Amino acid sequence: MKKLQLVLFLVLVIIFGMLFFVKKDNSNNVDLSKPEVAGESILAGLKVSYLDIGQGDASLIEFPSGEQMLVDCAIDGRILEALGRVMPYYDHDIDYLLITHPDLDHYGGCTEILKRFDVKNIIYNGLEKRGDAMWEAFWQALQEENANYIEIDKEEVWQIASTTMHILYPDHSIKQNKNIPGTSSEVNANDTSIVFKLSYLDKSLLFMGDAEEPLEEYLLTTYGEQLDADVIKLGHHGSDSSSSEELLTMTSPTDSVA
């Protein structure tokens, strides 16, 4: 019995030693191998958690500096439970809240986020849905938050910590004209989504919001090979209306997330 206990003890020592060695590896080479926890992309010091909340969409980006960006808030207060699985209970700050577009399954939980967290920057595409009670409540909560409000109305490149965030769309004021440039057909809210590419070291992630094929075609024409990415967050939850063969060929991702 004592020999068995000794063997088990030695096995545990070896396992913990290996874990310690892995954690102490400070190499700058980005590793896109499958993470230990499903629903995450881990690129050295950059971590993206794709939150499992049933209906809706939400992702938490944790930058190498420790700053955090929440991309969309799902449909309701379940976002708080989902964040509780990836954030410390004592963390009441979110540096950036980015709402890609005003579909309820993307902004519905934002009012709960604004009640629970101190949000420093709010990023939005500017599309208004006056007369919609849910959107009106969301908009009122945004106005009451003491945060820096950023409305995306042009292509921009931001530096956050040591990452580059290239905002690809909207590249014009959605308030003035929500249609895709060069087209006259009316678009729904999905094709007003904020689309951005996040690059860190030699790897990149492309976030498509709810972009459907008409917006994908415009992005392909406008940006071409700039859309190439290692990981793509598929548009419109991976539905048939998005992620055309042309887009996937151009982006040539190693991994995709619906």
Where are these predicted regions, by residue range?
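Non-globular, low-confidence helical/coil segments that flank catalytic cores
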Residues: 2-258
